[in-house]
């Protein structure tokens, strides 16, 4: 715990918990905000990020000690933290923030209708008699023209309920001049009502007419706070009475009732409609449900309304994509950044286990006994979060198990619809509008059964039959979107089960994502300082020093630069052999040293088997200030985490005190205080969540504030004539002097499988591999022209002929025969040797990766790990690609209607402009990616387990999980009968590196999609080594039969990102386009691309190249390496794919 006077909490100054900002409008700032805000068509409130020099002044204090109430002439200060967003009230010119907004249709009606069907109804009747304050009133009060200024509110987490209720009092006389960037502005404090009145009977229901008459109440602001903050919280908690939830959180903040149960009286449960659960199971599930609610509500605001550092990303003009850029460049960079984000938002929507849907607490049945209870371990295994989409189709029961809410009838063969998408947005029209914007810029995945979204657009725009927009905006409306993305939405009919949770968050600096993670890292080992037999124990194992020696060698030999990028140059076959031989010798020498060092440590092998990759995700709310939509995701994730962690103490309590009362609320009120007090201890230093604790000194001080009693007597709203403000020196007391803030949580992955017999990690028999598909393929393809300067065919074609020993049929000059034979023999030897100890199911793509893979493979082989793959973590990096506008109609003019589909495509061909779309591409260096501070979309499972023998504590661990769904991303792969289970040994993380984007770089040392099926066929073609003709023509024929006009990025994906093949294919496609060829059979392609070097039998000069004595056979590999090569997959038709295609 930090208790010095210089910690964030102690050094926080006194300040108000909410402000009204009035700042000048300029075209530049409007252009910027238009790209960053959340809007809704029928709301005059816009949600914008809290950023320095954009919405707040530089140096704006995020953590302040707010004057909350006046008691016995003493001011009570409470530490508060500002929300990372502001709320712009823009009723006079609401179109200012809609330049970049898609017209998505009647989203508010859709959201409210869905919310009502799910049971979340809004009630604003309590505000009927309130006096409204508009942005025009604010501008008038401070005497500025409303057309030149806009008005917005910044508020702390603790004050948000007071702002919602309209209880905060504007101090119009305390008008402060500020400067935001080069714009002039003002700000006015919003004062707590309890500086002027008292709350009674521990219930905050203010009746003081001064508060009701003068409190800052804006109906659109109240509704926006309801839909963006409070109802999403209620949805995450499965708590239908949102109004009661708001009153509870307000009462808790003012009256400090955190340790008492507040929600149980009005909770509605759905577990009683589950016929698979016994009565005892239902009671246990109901108690877990409500207690998770109570714990989360009690801790959520105190955690958020605490002390936090201001991250560097709050300074907008220091972002690398903004700094020193022209205004046009800034806007272009922001637009591209949003397209990168579209991949993450799409993943959240298309994943069936997304945090946006995963709000339901479920239980495995048949494990509880109503009288005897259940063990803690059993409860922890049986209680889990799952998707709550189907809560729409479940009955609701009250505290006494009486039916209070009838379910909505569930149709047969139900498909994902607008109600479900609204549920993902927690029924917020602001959030849903932005989600639709991102999905409109995502790719459509077509299947053989998918409905044509183009037909939907053509028919509904011409006839006006679209129910979402009446046919006026079918290029962007939510109705057309539901049709276009139908194949990518999750399947909601699948069985509900325990699954990982997918979320999108920022990583922190610490990450260890090397292949063996924590093994041999100094931070993970402690030196035993005890002496044994007169000798000092060995130094901690340090794998890094041996790897650094290899890197030093590479730098001396100019193979890599200081940043690890490849710099080697190869100009001949001999030089290639010399470089690789020297590098391999260095790797093996350092490996021998490491193995020798490992012998000194008795537990080194166990440490190797338990090696752990890990990274941390940021829980500072201000890290997400740049995106209000990510703030929404952050809050959903935080609630999910707190509920999951609460299950630990809940399970212990239920196990000790089984339910015996007739009403759940009686049991909850009896036991909640102990649950509340034990929760903090149960999560502190338990392996998952990291908190920062602060202790504040000087709990009693003196400070000068407005004379609040005088202000109430002489309250004025007219500020045209400035007058002096009466002030008083008050004695101030802190509400509490211990606070805890959220720092991060950790996600781990163990790459070495525990189950040695698991089929998912067994190595299949691939036979003798072609070197072009081996560990050095990245070099022989990169330096193909340097190694074979007189060869005009592609690397794949040449090595296929070498492999099949058919070069003697072609006139080709490979160079000196002895050099060629030596080089080819060397390549096959390296390929066979590498594969003999290979445990990594990925090919290296750089020198650094080759070093790491070879080092790890040989280390594992020497340690007894043989015949098995290990798990790997694949970073899928977002990238932007050019695409055709046909698939992204959001870029077209909405007023244009089309009579036929052909007319639509003809119009698209005439479209002028570049259209980009966000996609993903596998990134070879996962650890290097995490050094670039990426925004990640990651699936994780929160596991709970007991400690070692003698330790009764329950620990938590975040385990890297999987994505659930078939339409998430085509790089996630496909499960099929002929798969070798590589999808089971690969974990994927979507990454967008933010270094050089938002962060400045710090120098230091069962849909089956057409593309998926095609990629599998091409992979099989590349894996089958049979000769007879150019393998590239077979690949080209297969691609052109299925893909119309593929672009370079399509070819990269289909060929597994083998650039040399994609480039060669792309060149051939250009030739075909110029010749206007329509037949893509292998025979037709052979006529267009004849073997230029093929001669007749009498003229063949390549007959001297016979490599049959060089290329090893499978029996040779068995004899040399001792590998047990077995048939892994049985394919009914053993005819090679190339031959089947020709037949």
UniProtKB/Swiss-Prot annotation:
- Source domain of life: Viruses
Annotated family: Belongs to the herpesviridae major DNA-binding protein family.
Q: Which gene encodes it?
A: DBP
Name one molecular function that GO assigns to this entry: single-stranded DNA binding
Please give the Pfam families that the UniProt record associates with this protein.
Viral_DNA_bp
Q: Name one GO biological process term.
A: DNA replication
The record's annotation in Gene3D superfamilies points to: Viral ssDNA binding protein, head domain
For the keyword DNA-binding, the answer is: yes
Task: Report whether DNA-binding shows up as a keyword of the record.
Answer: yes
Ranges for the region named Required for nuclear localization are 1140-1143
Its biological function? Plays several crucial roles in viral infection. Participates in the opening of the viral DNA origin to initiate replication by interacting with the origin-binding protein. May disrupt loops, hairpins and other secondary structures present on ssDNA to reduce and eliminate pausing of viral DNA polymerase at specific sites during elongation. Promotes viral DNA recombination by performing strand-transfer, characterized by the ability to transfer a DNA strand from a linear duplex to a complementary single-stranded DNA circle. Can also catalyze the renaturation of complementary single strands.
| Annotated Gene Ontology cellular component terms | host cell nucleus
Q: Give the main location.
A: host cell
* Locations listed in the record: Host nucleus
**InterPro entries from the UniProt entry:** DBP_sf (IPR035989), Viral_ssDBP_head (IPR043031), Viral_ssDNA-bd (IPR000635)
Q: What protein does this entry describe?
A: Major DNA-binding protein
The UniProt subunit note reads as follows: Homooligomers. Forms double-helical filaments necessary for the formation of replication compartments within the host nucleus. Interacts with the origin-binding protein. Interacts with the helicase primase complex; this interaction stimulates primer synthesis activity of the helicase-primase complex. Interacts with the DNA polymerase. Interacts with the alkaline exonuclease; this interaction increases its nuclease processivity.
Q: Which UniProt keywords apply?
A: DNA replication, DNA-binding, Host nucleus
């Amino acid at each position: 715990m930090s208790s010095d006077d210089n910690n964030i909490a102690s050094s926080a100054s006194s300040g108000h918990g909410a402000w009204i900002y009035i700042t000048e409008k300029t075209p530049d700032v409007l252009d910027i905000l238009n790209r960053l805000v959340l809007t809704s068509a029928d709301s005059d409130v816009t949600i914008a990020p809290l950023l320095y020099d954009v919405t707040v002044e530089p140096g704006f204090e995020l953590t302040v000690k707010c004057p909350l109430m006046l008691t016995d002439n003493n001011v009570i200060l409470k530490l508060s933290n500002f929300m990372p967003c502001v709320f712009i009230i823009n009723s006079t010119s609401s179109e200012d923030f809609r330049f970049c907004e898609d017209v998505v249709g009647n989203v508010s009606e859709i959201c409210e209708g869905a919310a009502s069907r799910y049971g979340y109804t809004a009630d604003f009747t309590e505000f009927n008699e309130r006096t409204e304050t508009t942005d025009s009133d604010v501008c008038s009060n401070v005497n500025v023209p409303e057309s030149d200024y806009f008005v917005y509110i910044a508020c702390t987490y603790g004050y948000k309920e007071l702002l919602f209720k309209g209880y905060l009092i504007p101090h119009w006389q305390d008008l402060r001049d500020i400067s935001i960037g080069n714009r002039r502005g003002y700000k006015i404090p919003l004062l707590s009502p309890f500086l002027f009145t008292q709350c009674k009977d521990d219930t905050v229901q203010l009746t003081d007419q001064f508060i009701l008459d003068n409190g800052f109440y804006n109906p659109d602001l109240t509704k926006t706070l309801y839909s963006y903050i409070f109802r999403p919280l209620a949805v995450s908690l499965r708590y239908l009475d949102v109004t009661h939830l708001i009153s509870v959180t307000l009462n808790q903040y003012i009256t400090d009732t955190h340790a008492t149960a507040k929600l149980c009286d009005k909770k509605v449960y759905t577990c009683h409609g589950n016929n698979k659960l016994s009565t005892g199971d239902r009671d246990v599930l109901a108690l877990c449900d409500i207690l998770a609610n109570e714990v989360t509500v009690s801790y959520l605001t105190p955690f958020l309304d605490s002390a936090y550092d201001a991250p560097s990303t709050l300074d907008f003009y220091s972002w690398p994509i903004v700094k020193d850029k022209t205004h046009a460049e800034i806007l272009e960079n922001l637009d591209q950044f949003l397209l990168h984000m579209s991949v993450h938002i799409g993943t959240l929507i298309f994943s069936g286990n997304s945090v946006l849907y995963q709000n339901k607490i479920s239980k495995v049945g048949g494990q509880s006994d109503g009288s005897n209870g259940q063990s803690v371990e059993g409860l922890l295994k049986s209680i889990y979060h799952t998707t709550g989409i189907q809560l729409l189709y479940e009955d609701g029961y009250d505290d006494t198990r009486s039916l209070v809410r009838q379910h909505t009838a569930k149709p047969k063969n139900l498909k994902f619809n607008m109600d479900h998408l609204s549920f993902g947005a927690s029924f917020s029209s602001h959030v849903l509008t932005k989600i639709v914007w991102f999905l409109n810029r995502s790719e459509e995945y077509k299947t053989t059964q998918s409905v044509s979204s183009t037909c939907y657009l053509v028919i509904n725009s011409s006839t006006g039959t679209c129910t979402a927009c009446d046919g006026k905006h079918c290029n962007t409306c939510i109705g057309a979107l539901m049709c276009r993305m139908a194949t990518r939405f999750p399947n909601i009919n699948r069985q509900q089960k325990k699954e990982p949770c997918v979320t999108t968050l920022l990583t922190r600096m610490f990450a260890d994502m090397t292949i063996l993670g924590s093994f041999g890292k100094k931070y993970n080992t402690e030196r035993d300082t005890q002496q044994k037999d007169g000798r000092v124990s060995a130094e901690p194992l340090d794998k890094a020093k041996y790897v650094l020696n290899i890197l030093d060698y590479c730098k001396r030999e100019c193979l890599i630069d200081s940043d690890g990028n490849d710099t080697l140059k190869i100009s001949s076959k001999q030089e290639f052999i010399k470089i690789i031989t020297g590098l391999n010798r260095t790797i093996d020498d350092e490996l021998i040293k490491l193995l020798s060092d490992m012998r000194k440590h008795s537990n080194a092998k166990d440490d190797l088997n338990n090696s752990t990759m890990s990274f941390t995700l940021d829980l500072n709310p201000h890290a997400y200030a740049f995106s209000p939509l990510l703030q929404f995701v952050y809050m959903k994730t935080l609630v999910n985490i707190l509920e999951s962690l609460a299950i630990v103490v809940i399970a212990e309590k239920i196990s000790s005190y089984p339910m015996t009362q007739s009403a759940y609320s009686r049991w909850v009120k009896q036991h909640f205080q102990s649950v509340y007090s034990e929760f903090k201890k149960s999560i502190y230093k338990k392996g998952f969540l990291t908190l920062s604790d602060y202790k504040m000194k000087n709990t009693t001080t003196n400070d000068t504030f407005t004379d609040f009693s005088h202000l109430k007597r002489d309250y004025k709203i007219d500020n045209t004539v400035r007058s002096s403000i009466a002030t008083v020196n008050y004695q101030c007391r802190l509400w509490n002097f211990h606070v805890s803030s959220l720092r991060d949580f950790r996600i781990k992955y163990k790459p070495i499988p525990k189950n040695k017999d698991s089929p998912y990690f067994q190595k299949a028999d691939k036979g003798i591999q072609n070197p072009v598909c081996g560990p050095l393929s990245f070099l022989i393809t990169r330096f193909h022209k340097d190694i074979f300067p007189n060869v005009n065919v592609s690397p794949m074609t040449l090595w296929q002929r070498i492999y099949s020993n058919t070069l003697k049929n072609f006139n080709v000059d490979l160079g000196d025969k002895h050099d060629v034979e030596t080089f080819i023999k060397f390549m096959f030897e390296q390929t066979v040797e590498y594969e003999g100890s290979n445990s990594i199911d990925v090919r290296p793509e750089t020198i650094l990766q080759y070093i790491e893979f070879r080092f790890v493979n040989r280390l594992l082989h020497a340690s007894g790990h043989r015949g098995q793959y290990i798990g790997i973590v694949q970073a899928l990096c977002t990238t932007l690609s050019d695409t055709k506008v046909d698939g992204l109609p959001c870029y077209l003019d909405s007023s244009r209607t089309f009579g036929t589909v052909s007319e639509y495509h003809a119009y698209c061909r005439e479209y002028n402009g570049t259209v980009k779309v966000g996609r993903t591409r596998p990134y070879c260096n996962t650890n290097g990616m995490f050094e670039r501070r990426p925004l990640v979309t990651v699936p994780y499972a929160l596991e709970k387990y007991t400690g070692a023998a003698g330790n009764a504590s329950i620990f938590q661990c975040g385990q890297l999980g999987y994505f659930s769904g078939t339409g998430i991303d085509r790089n996630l792969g496909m499960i099929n009968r002929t798969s070798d289970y590589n999808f089971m040994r690969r974990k994927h993380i979507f990454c967008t590196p933010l270094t050089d984007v938002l962060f400045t770089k710090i120098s230091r040392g069962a849909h089956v999609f057409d593309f998926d099926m095609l990629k599998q066929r091409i992979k099989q073609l590349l894996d089958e080594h049979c000769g007879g003709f150019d393998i590239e023509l077979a690949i080209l024929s297969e691609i052109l039969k299925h893909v119309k006009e593929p672009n370079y990025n399509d070819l990269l994906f289909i060929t597994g990102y083998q650039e040399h093949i994609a480039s060669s294919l792309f060149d051939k496609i250009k030739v075909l386009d110029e010749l206007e060829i329509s037949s893509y059979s292998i025979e037709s392609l052979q006529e267009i691309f004849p073997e230029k070097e093929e001669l007749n039998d009498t003229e063949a000069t390549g007959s001297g190249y016979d490599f049959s004595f060089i290329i090893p056979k499978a029996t040779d590999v068995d004899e040399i390496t001792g590998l047990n090569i077995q048939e892994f997959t049985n394919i009914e038709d053993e005819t090679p794919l190339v031959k089947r295609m020709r037949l």
